[in-house]
Amino acid sequence: MLEEQVNALDSTVNRLSAIENSTTWRAVQPIISVLIKLKRAKSLVLYLPRIIRQKGLRNTLKYAFQVFKSGGLRTLVHTALNNSARGHVHSLTERDFINKPSVLAHEVCLNSVTIIAELSIQQCTKYRVTQKKEMLELLGFKCEVVSWTDYYQSRTSISHSSVVIFYRVPSTDTVLALIEECKRLNVKTFWEVDDLIFNEAILAESKTVSDLSSEVRTQVLEGANSYKQALLACDMAIASTSGLAESMNAEGVENVFILENCLDSETLQLANEILKSSEKKQKIDNKIRIVYGSGTSTHNIDFEEAASSIAKVLRENSQVIFRIIGLLELPSSFDGLDAQVERFELCSYSEYLRLLSECDISIAPLEKYIFNEAKSNIKYIEASIVKLPSVSSPLSAFIDVIDDGVNGYIASDQVEWFDKLTKLVCCEQTRQDMAINANTTVLARYNTESIANTQLMPIVRDYSCIKTKPRIVVFNVFYSPRSFGGATIVTEQINKLLQKHKGYEVYVVTTLPVDDALRAYEPVRYEVEGVTVFGVPVPNEDMELYNNKSIVKPVAKILEVVKPDLAHAHCLQGLGIGALQSCIDKNINYIVTVHDAWWLCYKQFMIDSKGEFCGQDKIDLSKCKNCTDNQKTPSLRDAELRHYLKNACEVLAPSSYTAELHDLNNMHPKPLTVDRNGILMPKASIVKKFDGSITFGYVGGNTPIKGSDLVLKAFSNVNNSKAFLKIVDNMINLGHKSYPDHVVSSINNCTIVPGYNQNNIDDFFESIDVLLFPSRCKESFGLTVREAIARNVWVITTDSGGVTECIIEGENGNVIPFSSDSKKLENAINNVITHYEKLKLGDDVDLPKDSIAYFSDQVDNLDGIYKSYL
């Protein structure tokens, strides 16, 4: 059985080799290669097991081999990756948070163009991709080129783009998904091509296509429909010639721009070197050479336009040689002229120009058919830069530039071909004059700067944007929809207010989880309440890295297109100091807010290997070695983090405690500036009325470090029918429970409730009277404590750092020793019950809260800090 399959594969190899070397294959090879990528790769990877079951190993091998044959291993790998994404191409839009932003892409990503292109055709890549990149950069745009077969990289590039140009791509599922992603992000799209490959009816009438086998011909015509769908899916189109533009208009595309091929700096340099080295005056012999750069055998039919005339010129002028560069089947009119025909195989571009420069006359015959009206005049341009006169067919691209008899000849029929070639053969002066005129014409008209300014700039002008407001880029480990932690809540709120009320444009860089649709370190752009967010998927195993080098490149790209004036780093966990390295590389000043002990301690909250707060103020790195397997990590980490923190133009702390702790450890040349975190102001003035019951609340999560065990044990000993305990379990909103039923069932009057957010925070605090906050670690701020006091909720807290700075003992809360056990917490609870029982029903509970800062206060303070560095 295996031997039969191997023999079948050998047969397939031989058959494919025969096809590949046939004239018909070479005629439409660029289209066929794309079709193979489309049709054979669809099932290659994602559905491989099913294919083998249904079709057998033999057909599976044939599929894989045809893809490999069309483009080699690189194409096979790209195709596999591309099609493994097929099941996920729509899943981004299925995520609620990945929404349609309110701003236009070019107002976010400044002057950034992505070209998603078919790159397998060397000449097309040179003239339509590489040249365009050079011209865009000349105009002040950043330009990135991506293969259309790389779905994920293409999608990532779209997030960074003002404009996306799809060059010569078909309408695969992945390409259409990329176009949809552009629409989601308000990115303008252009579909570009330099051949009339999108009109089935015109291709069907082409003599070249008619020569193909019925199977291949069917594939080519199907390909035309695929290209047409891609053309119509984009906003606008770009054509290489006026004839091609007219065909695009005829398909229903309203806005079509013409962008001609031009002479890039590399080509001009190459031409100049060839001219200098050969000094055309030094001829290789006394022959006069007519040259035809036929390239592939697709030009057999085109050559018929001039074939008999050229043969006649050769017969009447024995000193004339006909040089062919590439593949060409000569008709019978050339019989007996072998001595006057010289052939050169397909070669590199530099060798092609050298062979061209050795000749005297260039020809560009093209069949008089609408398909060729789309062709560019590149043969005329290439001949002109090496100072050859040309005779060309009367198609639009040539008529547009050639002044007949001055800088070239136009030949409409065999008589004109013979007459005009004869004039050039017989008169050296005519050849020289015409060559100089042609050279002058193309250097003036087709130089990169000229084409960039006259043809490309009108295409991209509307998407060129300059900053009108100062731009701040903000780094934080989490962001909506993953609004985890107090620092994240603070960051979200102040960003929104800075942008809305202080005239800044704020851009956020945060982490996202990696999954099937979100690949590691390939950012996705979305929007939260008017603020642009770049979510960088970071693998779980990298979230603990303090120096995540993989983050540098994606962050650098974001900075490159956003062009911020200042960066503000909040919590860098997950992102790491690599984000700051990107700022340094781009010469962007940055401010750091130290929201916790991450800058001081390998363990973010200074929790030692026993799960307890380590108790250090002045950090002793020798003690830190007990918390890590690698003894070198603490000192290395400390040195690196100090370097980046000292490079900050200012370091902020949310509380005096946090500022003093970092100052004690000399983390920055200047004392840290206290920038007290704000909280959300209550929607209305909340004056509580005592209703006879006392409800205690705990929101710290089911973890001993936050004191959950103290709360449960203390309250189990509280015997008062008027006292209730309400525990917030944030996991409920995620479909889980963090408190088993048996843990709380033995506690009287205890209920578990889902977590709250900034939209229903008032409702939660209105439902409790006292907040329990018996933290066993030092808190840098204590957002929940301040939210409670602002809403007239009494607080019982341990002496845990920044938390206590808003507590007025006995007036809005109680501070118990940091080392308190459950008994001390129980005593504090009973004391508060006694205090509240002294109130009468309906008495007001209005606690002092003057030390509380709101988000508006913090934004005012940050505005002043930012302005000092702008």
Task: Label every PLM stretch briefly.
Residues 61-64, 68-148, 313-315, 465-521, ...:
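N-terminal subdomain of nucleotide-sugar transferases
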Residues 276, 429-459, 820, 824, ...:
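A charged, aromatic-enriched C-terminal amphipathic alpha-helix characteristic of glycosyltransferases
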Residues 151, 327-330, 340-359, 367-370, ...:
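Conserved active-site histidine-acidic residue motif and adjacent donor-binding/catalytic loop
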Residues 402-415, 423-428, 809-810, 814-822, ...:
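Conserved acidic donor-binding segment of nucleotide-sugar-dependent glycosyltransferases
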Residues 120-139, 263-358, 692-739:
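Conserved catalytic-core segment of nucleotide-activated headgroup transferases in glycan assembly
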Residues 1-99:
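Boundary detector for helix-to-coil junctions that initiate low-complexity/charged tails
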Residues 221, 228-256, 263-268, 329-331, ...:
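A short, active-site helix/loop in glycosyltransferases that binds the activated sugar's phosphate group
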Residues 199, 301-304, 349-355, 362-385, ...:
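Nucleotide-sugar-dependent
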